[in-house]
């Protein structure tokens, strides 16, 4: 969190200790109508679902031009199948959520009415299938904090300049 990062930086500064801070946040992928959809989908799926989204560099959500959103979502579904198989939870190479507390928090972020891929979980194994949520807004629970898990919200835009401005106005 930014609050903890400020505290760590203040203590490090007292002793001139060099530090690098990764403060988490809501890091979006922006896909406009000029993007190579297949390449974008492959990279987004790899980055998001590597280690079940539990990496500090994982994309947090996708902001996609409305005109290519359906194609992107369809291609991301294909990439999930290609990278993890038809049943990711049965794939020995697909990971688990770090602990039960984090698993429960993630499950609470999933709105079943917005799930277009995945959404399946196994509480005994602490696994959540790669999940894509569509028709997401900034008011949804999944957009209120860093996800740090295998849940990918998709939002659309009509103006690239407007979306960049909107992202820059929000806390990251």
Regions found by a protein language model. Give the residues of each.
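ALDH superfamily catalytic-core signature
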Residues: 2-137, 159-161, 165-168
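Conserved glycine-rich beta-strand-loop-beta hairpin in the small C-terminal domain of fold type I
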Residues: 124-129, 145-151, 170-172
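Cytochrome P450 core scaffold surrounding the K-helix E-X-X-R motif
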Residues: 139-144
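Short acidic-hydrophobic, aromatic-tinged amphipathic segments that line or gate anion-handling sites
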Residues: 154-158
